Amino acid sequence: MEDSGKEEDDKKSCCTWPKIIVAAILTVTSCVVLWKYAPIDSAIDSILPKFNKTSGEYTGMGDAFGDIPPTQAPSVPDRFNFMQCKQGKECCNGLTKICHLRVDEVLYATAHNAMASFEDGFLFGPNHRLQLERALFAGYRGINLDICNCAGLLVFCHGYCSLGIRGVDEVFASINGFLDSNPTEVLMIPLEINNFADESVDLDQFYFQMTQIPGLTEKVYVHENAGAPWPTLKEAVDSNKRIFMFHFNGPDCTAGDPCPPGLHLYDKYAINTNWEFRNKEDVEDTATSCDLVLKEALSHQAFFGVNNFLSPPSYAVSKTLNSVDFARERIRACSEQANLDVNFIYADFWSEGALPELVQEHNRELAR
């Protein structure tokens, strides 16, 4: 009996040690990933101060950054006020003199994977420090989101459901509220369909969730004729069709399987540059970084997106990539190489740099 008990103890010991070793390896790996990819440096210096949720009423850049002192990150010089229109004057996306331009003629600062913020619990490899609602107040008029089906529930996630999610209802209610409070603003929302996070994404189910938010789908523009010109900003504002949505990596919206109204196929109407850049030097090599993806599919493409971020995301490098001088030169180089006007400048860590300021500079020049 004693030998039998000893053998049993030996078996338990043999089974236990591998489990302990595996657990230790997983713990160390998690710590390394968190240290390497999460913006710990910036998080620690502020201990993520008591961020105020956005109220929906625009009162300037203070709304975007809450109680973060001007001398702390985010490093936006003088907290540029995107809304440049004088009271009582015609206004479109913060400027008075661009309303006559079509929506496919102007530039939009676009938050890449906008849902994946450290503030909203995306701790492993977040794309942003602060949530997307603040980006709207800061002047970002492009919001890129990834749709996932997590255990039957459609949410916004990045990569895997376990790495963080944001509710579709919550995000779109915030966007809808922002537009209600800012009736001169027009938004671009490119959606990536992620069918690999868990289950497949059903766009009809996604659209149904959108219809549950009062007034949201009424603001969604539908481009009925692929060859027709896109509306001007003024036409979008006057008709209150101020949300322009696109999707990619999902259904192809053929006649036999049409997509919900207003969910346009991105590859049909837009084209992007390369996006897999490991360091700043990769981005600076415009001979390759400005190359077009799927350029053989050019047909009715009216929009041109320039990717301006690293993979995996880099908080430190984003300060340079999102600076006015760097982004201005990248837009110029890619536009010249592709012979296309840039519409989307996709960025991580939107709170760094000054892309909204560059956008207003760029769009103001277009109006001259």
Label each PLM-derived region with a short phrase.
Residues E2-S4, W17, I21-R368:
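Catalytic cores of phosphodiester-bond hydrolases, prominently lipid phosphodiesterases
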Residues E7-W17:
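Short, Lys/Arg-rich cytosolic juxtamembrane segment immediately N-terminal
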